[in-house]
């Protein structure tokens, strides 16, 4: 009987050890996998204030910058040659975290970001970005509370419709530093 109990105990330790090793390996893979971050800069000034705000938020992180001014994205409903929406969409799908940056123009999100958002409507299924995070950087020269609220409303609705987890908005460096905690 002692021998059977000893064998059972050894077998239990062997199984438990293998299970722990498997779980540990799984945890290491999660730690080793660095999240892929895409910063979409809607500003026509690629090195301007929107990009500077992204640098504050993403300091110490590896990320890719996609300047919308470098892409031709036709407005919703146009079917012109040379449209690059699919390229931008693919980069967004490949990312774990998307940081959308827009200057405040005419009291709202800039046209290049607006066109990108509008192009999702229709061809892109709701919930397509489930499990991905969206951060919003929205800056301008003294935007009013209404402008900030409207921009955030638009971005949070976009995130909700397409399945992103909306992590929030920053419109200044101190807010970007605080938002960085969610990365």
Named regions from a protein language model:
Residues 2-7:
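Sec-dependent signal peptide recognition
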Residues 11-12, 44-45, 141-143:
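Short, glycine/serine-rich, charged loops/turns that create anion-binding
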Residues 12-13, 77:
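Alpha-helical transmembrane segments and their juxtamembrane interfaces
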Residues 15-19:
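C-terminal motif of bacterial Sec signal peptides marking the signal peptidase cleavage site
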Residues 130-168:
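Short, glycine-/small-residue-rich phosphate/pyrophosphate-handling segment
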